[in-house]
Amino acid sequence: MASAAVGNYEEEIVRPVADFSPSLWGDQFLSFSIENQVAEKYAQEIEALKEQTRSMLLENGRKLADTLYLIDIIERLGISYHFEKEIDDILDQIYNQNSNCNDLCTSALQFRLLRQHGFNISPEIFSKFQDENGKFKESLASDFLGLLNLYEASHVRTHADDILEEALAFSTIHLESAAPHLKSPLREQVTHALEQCLHKGVPRVETRFFISSIYEKEQSKNDVLLRFAKLDFNLLQILHKQELAEVSRWWKDLDFVTTLPYARDRVVECYFWALGVYFEPQYSQARVILVKTISMISIVDDTFDAYGTIKELETYTDAIQRWDINEIDRLPDYMKISYKAILDLYKDYEKELSSAGRSHIVCHAIERMKEVVKNYNVESTWFIEGYMPPVSEYLSNALATTTYYYLATTSYLGMKSATEQDFEWLSKNPKILEASVIICRVIDDTATYEVEKSRGQIATGIECCMRDYGVSTKEAMAKFQGMAEAAWKDLNEGFLRPTPVSTEILFRILNLARIVEVTYIHNLDGYTHPEKVLKPHINALLVDSIEI
């Protein structure tokens, strides 16, 4: 209960305070001292290893299976960003040659790699492994590596790939049965894949796991690739720690923990989110811009969800639409803090991008933010007034409140390659973006349903679905899961060439969907309660280096 003075009277204001847990990290990431000699040594050795790896990739006369395996290992080890053109050229050649393999393992690997790189290879590549009834042959049940690759390939399916629905069911049931009896490290790889498939995983998280838990234990490992991957991971981690220290200092200076104690203090988790969108060194500026934006919109989200009154939120919404510092006097004191911080942040972005002649693109992110706040206000009004909208009305508003239209747009601000045409394309909410947003919405809604219900929130997606369709909670959640699966098919389809924008642009949209899958795994809200889900990932990526 909070009180506010109105005229000569004091009015009691009941606020829906959520009582979020404090940060897990304290000042742990506030400072970071770099050992320049170590970093320089890593960088020098990496250059030599890079050339050795390039020679491996460009080697002539290798079998198709060996080429595909090499590309897969390089990608899983997190070093493929050094060889994007070489890998694309090789896969282009394989696609155009229409090469076919007779074994399940190679066929599935070929299908997945080509699809992930935008080549529309036909799923008919798998028909040779089916019987006359269209079922996968039971003789494949003992080909565990083949089944694992088939399972991973099934997750890049589109709406036209019915055969891959069967592939997913077939591979899953046999892998689940076999997993406890497999030898290490295949056992660990299969167990991990069944919990988190590669295609929907956060690239850095998957790389860390693969280096330490799988490839290092492989008898057939390539020592050059393994050392390259370890050094590259540790060198990038130094950069990531520097960025996190910079962002942590910025966050501490804002002092929202003291001035806005009702909001979640999650700047480290926000950095993990940005790291999931892009980990490569050339995106350093983009990452810092994105993490600051996520941290700031999280404060705004909690203001609407967990503190503001209808009148305050309407005034705040109007002030954001006007985007003028003179509006600040209309706001209650606590809202002035975030309002000024937001306007200052975007001025900083404009100043930072002006040296590259890109300050004009910031307006795209501002417009998206205005949209989010407007939709937050609708959502809060529903909550406070006890209104439960039809599912269609709920979704038309709730897709914007995922913040994913906004974050996708913001993710391009620091990308030097992002053009005005890319921003215009994104502003039309293309199908691939809609898919990523839907994935975020339905996974978030499913994971947070019980908590929101306990707080008296009736206008949730699950509740609206239950009422509209006359179904149980379990059935409503299954419907939402079906929406997520359909959206993943749309997203995968959006990657197939020809595409209206570059793959580099599309990858941000894909990676945003991946982060949601990981953050809300097992229907846990890993952002609000990071101790179970995100803490191990953050430790693996930002605390513990890999032993060389």
UniProtKB/Swiss-Prot annotation:
The enzyme's E.C. designation: 4.2.3.61
Binding site for Mg(2+) 2: 301, 305
Matching SUPFAM superfamilies: Terpenoid cyclases/Protein prenyltransferases (SSF48239), Terpenoid synthases (SSF48576)
Compartments in which it is found: Cytoplasm
Residues annotated for Mg(2+) 1 binding in this entry: 301, 305
Listed pathway(s): Secondary metabolite biosynthesis; terpenoid biosynthesis
Enzyme class name: lyase
Motif DDXXD motif boundaries: 301-305
This protein's GO CC annotations: cytoplasm
Record field: catalytic activity: (2E,6E)-farnesyl diphosphate = (+)-5-epi-aristolochene + diphosphate
Binding site for Mg(2+) 3: 444, 448, 452
UniProt free text on domains: The Asp-Asp-Xaa-Xaa-Asp/Glu (DDXXD/E) motif is important for the catalytic activity, presumably through binding to Mg(2+).
Function: Catalyzes the cyclization of trans,trans-farnesyl diphosphate (FPP) to the bicyclic intermediate 5-epi-aristolochene, initial step in the conversion of FPP to the sesquiterpenoid antifungal phytoalexin capsidiol. Produces germacrene A as an enzyme-bound intermediate that is not released by the enzyme, but is further cyclized to produce the bicyclic 5-epi-aristolochene.
Family: Belongs to the terpene synthase family.
Oligomer status and interactors: Monomer.
Entry protein name: 5-epi-aristolochene synthase 3
